[in-house]
Design a protein with these regions (language model features):
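Structural recognition of alpha->loop->beta junctions
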Residues: 128-142, 203-221
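Acidic, Mg2+-coordinating phosphoryl-transfer loop and its flanking beta/alpha structural elements
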Residues: 171-211
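Substrate-recognition/cap helix-loop segment adjacent to the acidic, metal-dependent catalytic center
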Residues: 30-32, 56-62, 97, 101-111, ...
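Metal-dependent phosphoesterase signature
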Residues: 58-98, 106
Length: 225
């Protein structure tokens, strides 16, 4: 099967994340009196962030209104924007730009998709010089489709934009169960879990995938040989 498109996640897959997303989640939740355990925060990584907020509030025994979810999410977004605009820790995971370049040199399209909203995503792309068309071929955020992960909507929309017809010619690469669920739901030919950040191989192994990789160099070997 010929590979035509690789869809990469951002935080934890190609974007270094020293628990910055988790810190922002916990801070926004603490502001409304909720202290989720770390494993609950890890479990919602990869989901659209408003859905993650609603789930964490529900797990804390709340019956959150739409307004409460929106307020907590707005606090999370503000914390993330501050971090990605100013932190010296914002950098790629080793090998990310090289992987993108090698894939594109081989004639393979490269797109990012993410559970972040567009305002956060654009800050990341600016810091790392990954804006299309020079840094990649396309970017899609979970607030730009009807359903985020683990539904396949973002992958299908990226395929539509880039003229890719067969999901078996698409690879999805991510570091969360939601990423793997998304790739599997889309019918991607490659569904690769990266075990360098939020989840270990043991945590990802029960979820549908074709491969697990402990580095982006291994991802490159899997995709390009």
């Amino acid at each position: 099967m010929t590979l035509e498109l690789v869809v990469l996640d951002l935080a934890g897959t190609t974007l270094h994340d020293p628990d910055a997303v988790g810190v922002a989640f916990r801070g926004a939740m603490a502001a409304v009196g909720v202290t989720p355990p770390p494993e609950q925060v890890t479990a919602v990584m990869g989901l659209p962030k408003p859905e993650a907020v609603k789930l964490l509030l529900s797990q804390a025994g709340r019956d959150p209104s739409a307004d409460e979810v929106q307020a907590v999410h707005a606090d999370f977004v503000a914390r993330m924007k501050q971090y990605y605009a100013t932190s010296p820790e914002v950098r790629e995971i080793p090998g990310a730009t090289h992987l993108i370049a090698q894939l594109r040199q081989a004639g393979i399209r490269v797109a990012f998709n993410t559970g972040f909203s567009r305002d956060i995503t654009d800050l990341v792309l600016t810091r790392l010089n990954w804006h299309p068309p020079t840094g990649c071929d396309a970017v899609l955020c979970s607030d730009e489709v009807a359903r985020g992960r683990p539904y396949p909507d973002m992958i299908f929309e990226l395929m539509r934009r880039l003229g890719i017809r067969d999901p078996k010619k698409v690879a999805k690469v991510g570091d969360t169960a939601a990423d793997l669920g998304e790739g599997s739901a889309a019918g991607c030919g490659w569904v690769i879990g990266v075990t360098t950040c939020t989840h270990t191989a043991e945590q990802l192994r029960p979820h549908p995938h074709t491969h697990l990789a402990d580095s982006l160099a291994e991802v490159q070997r899997l995709l390009l040989g």
